[in-house]
A protein has these predicted regions:
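Acidic, Ser/Thr/Pro-rich intrinsically disordered cytosolic tails and loops
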Residues: 2-9, 22, 26-498
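Bacterial N-terminal signal peptides
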Residues: 10-19
């Protein structure tokens, strides 16, 4: 797999990971806890009491409390109290929303805003009209005890809803995938949640028998139709949908785990090496006529694919030319403790193209007929020189592969089908992980966060398959195995001669 394909694949996973990161909030406070107490009266009015804890991470002027309003609804008899700071407040009607702007100060003169590290408790109490709906057959309370208008996560929530009568009611907590818990106790509906994320909500919905309300309900909405069965059907449909989504999510989780076995199957089928009875009887002699760079191309390693050359191929070719007398090596004292090594070109007769190209690269750093490694090192510190060397080195590697390892020759030494299958699996895994991850983020269901984690894990497996060296997924042929063993034995025979 070439570098561009790998880079594209890694870019996909980066986009996926960035898409699931939370957006940085502009607010400078957190909300560790909230307590909400709601009283439903016989005339349809509800009274809301809120106790909200704030922790400020920097200095601040105050906070907002936005109360969304639907048609004909209104907030009345508002009272505000603050512990932990001096305060003022202002009510702003924004059309469809009542905004309560609470200014916070750390001095009685109300001239200095609060500082970082301040903990404040805000109390709000107000009457809310036309929230309860009265139908022909039943009354309904549908109220968000914590709404989705908040721009900060809530650490923990406790809420209680008190109805006119102690009789247990039919009730539901929405959304159906919410982790909030509810129970009926002493005629009250108790709700708790270990946290509500920004943009999420916790809603209570209850059917109230008409006999619990007075004959006159001026503070309720009156709707001339039967709605009890419709509400029950709607809630059941939502619950059934969530059950289905959660089941599908669990199946997808198991499927992603099962698919992780495919790379192991590919390795088992295509990556295991053939057994040989090779014995290095002649290890005291150079046992192969293949160029050192050829053997290097057949060798794998961390981050190195079979068939690619690295700097060791370049170095081994230099050593081979020295041993064959084509290059000479010399040194002279640089200081009392160090020496400078030089190469000299003795002959280029009979050299192969890749060897002549190597000599030409070295001659770029020739001074007075000697190739100085110290001078070469100094030159490569300059960006232009380093880039020029890298380009010539890359051309040298590619020309060698074209001459000695064209595809039909390479296939005689290495079977890369398994490596190709690893690449295909990696691409497919990334695409599937992105799809599953995106769906688990944007389609809410119980366990969606777990499915997102499985998608991330599966994407990591896909990336690993894309970047792993080809020697893991592929395998040497018998000819390649023997050639590689011969080449490794011959490395010990290469010595620099003077």
């Amino acid at each position: 797999m070439n570098f561009k394909n790998k880079a594209f694949a890694i870019l996909l996973i980066l986009i996926f990971c960035l898409s699931i990161l939370p957006t940085a909030s502009a607010v400078d406070y957190s909300i560790p806890y909230a307590n909400v107490d709601i009283q439903v009266y016989e005339d349809g009015l509800i009274n809301v009491y809120e106790e909200i804890d704030y922790h400020f991470d920097s200095s601040a002027n105050g906070v907002y409390r936005d109360i969304p309003l639907k048609r004909n609804q209104s907030v009345e008899n508002l009272r505000v109290y603050v512990e932990g700071a001096y305060y003022d407040y202002q009510i702003i009607d924004q059309g469809g929303m009542e905004r309560i702007k609470i200014y916070l100060y750390r001095d009685a003169a109300k001239t200095q805003k609060i500082t970082s590290g301040t903990d404040v408790k805000v109390y709000l109490q107000y009457d809310f009209t036309h929230v309860v709906k009265v139908y022909n057959d039943v009354a309904e309370l549908q109220y968000k005890v914590w709404g989705d208008e908040w721009e900060e996560d809530l650490g923990a929530l406790d809420a209680v809803i008190r109805f006119p009568d102690d009789t247990k009611l039919e009730y539901w907590i929405n959304p159906a995938y919410s982790d909030a818990k509810a129970k009926w106790s002493d005629g009250n509906l108790l709700i708790s949640s270990d946290g509500v994320s920004e943009g999420s909500y916790v809603e209570a919905r209850a059917l109230i028998p008409l006999e619990e309300l007075s004959s006159s309900t001026p503070y309720a909405q009156h709707i001339n139709k039967n709605a009890g069965d419709e509400i029950r059907s709607m809630q059941k449909s939502e619950a059934d949908t969530q059950t289905l989504l959660s089941t599908v999510g669990s199946i997808v989780n198991y499927l992603l785990v099962a698919l992780c076995a495919i790379p192991l199957a590919i390795y088992y089928k295509f990556g295991r090496e053939p057994k040989t009875d090779y014995q290095g009887i002649y290890e005291h002699e150079p046992p192969t006529n293949d160029p050192p760079a050829f053997v290097n191309a057949l060798m794998g390693g961390f981050g190195k694919n079979i068939g690619d050359l690295d700097q060791k191929a370049f170095q081994a070719t230099i050593m081979d030319l020295i041993n064959r007398g084509k290059l000479g090596v010399d040194s002279e004292d640089d200081t009392e403790f160090t020496k400078t090594t030089f190469l000299t070109v003795k002959s280029t007769d009979g050299l192969e193209r890749y060897e002549r190209e190597l000599v030409d690269i070295l001659r770029t750093y020739e001074l007075n007929g000697r190739i100085s490694f110290s001078y070469m090192q100094d030159c490569l510190r300059e960006e232009n020189q380093a880039r020029s060397y890298q380009d010539r080195y890359n051309n040298w590697c590619q020309n060698f592969k074209n001459d000695y390892l064209p595809e039909e020759v390479f296939d005689e030494y290495f079977d890369q089908k398994g490596s190709d299958y690893m690449m295909y699996f990696g691409i497919g895994a990334l695409i599937l992980a992105i799809i599953v991850g995106a769906l688990s983020i944007f389609i809410h269901f119980r366990g969606s966060f777990i499915t997102t984690l499985f998608a991330i894990f599966f994407a990591i497996v896909g990336v690993a398959c894309l970047i792993m060296p080809s020697g893991i997924g592929g395998k040497y042929t018998l000819k390649g195995k023997l050639t590689l063993k011969d080449g490794r034995n011959s490395r010990s025979s290469l010595r620099i001669t003077h």
